[in-house]
Amino acid sequence: MRYLRGEEAVTVRPEYAGTPIYVLAGFRSAMVAAKMGLGVILGGPVATQEAAARVYREHALADAPPIISSLNIAVADTPAVARDLLLPEAYAKVLAQSTGEFGALRPAGELDMDALTGQQRRRIEEALAHDVWGTVREVGEELRGVGKRLGVSEFVVTGDMPDVAGRARSEELLASLQAEN
């Protein structure tokens, strides 16, 4: 209370040691981050992250912060619902490759999948194959496997979802995974 009244200072314990800086990196940037003594958050497909993690560890300083993985992740009560949460972003990215414009994300039910070319549909499926989505059990198993492959214990969840209620449910289910660990 004395601090709140301005009568006394507070000693922070442990002492502030600085905020680590992380680089959101793919393969090449991981090596640069390692050589500069910076932490790394790996992005992209898991196979690319695996190679980047290996290079980072080969070149990192001994006291480098742990590697973090960034993945598009969606959890739902069924795999189909989880997939639909990530579909809008994959759809928009694929259309952007054809049109040059990244439009606003629309919920999966509003997407015109029939208007896509065969190549566009394949690209969407390829994009979703690099994402992590499914039920709590499925996502938990996949994240444990990815964690072992990459040697990471932390994930940054990415993936924009226009379905606000679905995103909230996904985050709730993801939090239940955290509680299990």
Where are these regions (language model features)?
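Active-site-proximal loop/turn and secondary-structure-junction residues that shape catalytic pockets
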Residues: V46, I73-V75, M161
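Hydrophobic faces of well-ordered beta-strands that scaffold small-molecule active sites
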Residues: T19-L24, L38-G43, P65-L71, F155-V157
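Bilobed periplasmic-binding protein-like "clamshell/Venus-flytrap" ligand-binding domains
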Residues: R149-D160
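Glycine-rich, proline-tolerant flexible connector loops at the mouths of alpha/beta enzymes
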Residues: G44, T158-G166
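Short, acidic/turn-prone active-site loops that include or flank metal/cofactor-
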Residues: G44-Q49, Q97-S98
